[in-house]
From Swiss-Prot:
Enzyme class, UniProt record, top EC level: transferase
Record keywords, A-Z: ATP-binding, Nucleotide-binding, Transferase, Ubl conjugation pathway
GO molecular function, one term: ATP binding
Function: Catalyzes the covalent attachment of ubiquitin to other proteins.
Pfam families xref list: UQ_con
Record protein name field: Ubiquitin-conjugating enzyme E2 J2-like
UniProt EC number: 2.3.2.23
Reaction catalysed by this enzyme: S-ubiquitinyl-[E1 ubiquitin-activating enzyme]-L-cysteine + [E2 ubiquitin-conjugating enzyme]-L-cysteine = [E1 ubiquitin-activating enzyme]-L-cysteine + S-ubiquitinyl-[E2 ubiquitin-conjugating enzyme]-L-cysteine
Domain named UBC core: residues: 15-165
Lineage of producing organism: Eukaryota, Amoebozoa, Evosea, Eumycetozoa, Dictyostelia
InterPro entries: Ub_conjugating_enzyme (IPR050113), UBQ-conjugat_E2_core (IPR000608), UBQ-conjugating_enzyme/RWD (IPR016135)
Organism: Dictyostelium discoideum
A single cellular component GO annotation: endoplasmic reticulum
Gene3D superfamilies named in the record: Ubiquitin Conjugating Enzyme
GO biological process, one term: ERAD pathway
Amino acid sequence: MSEHNSDIVHPPTKDCITRLKREFQEISKNPIENILVTPSPSNILEWHYVILGASNTPYEGGVYYGQLIFKYNYPLSPPSILMTTPSGRFETQKRLCLSISDYHPESWSPSWSTSSILLGLLSFMSDNEVTAGSIVTTNDEKRILATKSMDFNKKNKTFCELFPYLAMDE
């Protein structure tokens, strides 16, 4: 995912590393309902998440994989948010335009955490607001994509390596 990280020439600051490690420890102790997340083993600035489609939504049963790409000076700058799995809500492998993403650094608050970013993404996924990186589809189309999501994810090497318990055949 390094092609999405314009700060690849800048190593993360000490404050950035400390903050990201602390946030991962916090998420590990207090998991977010319907969301799994892990940093890349080789790059603390690259986190991978999975949103589990909530019951009674068009996403029910879906497994949606994506990335958070943090800037070297996080939390002073917001991360990029990308979705890999087709959901019918977001374009795949495009930066999402959210107030909690690098699309809107002017609205970013360093007090926001990875947990709040992921909760915001989950909330936005359930909303119908149209913005850069979002797409408009019917609920039926979203349901069809939900049923195909694991087959799609199983073709992604990084997904299978980081979330092997999800990628295993039942």
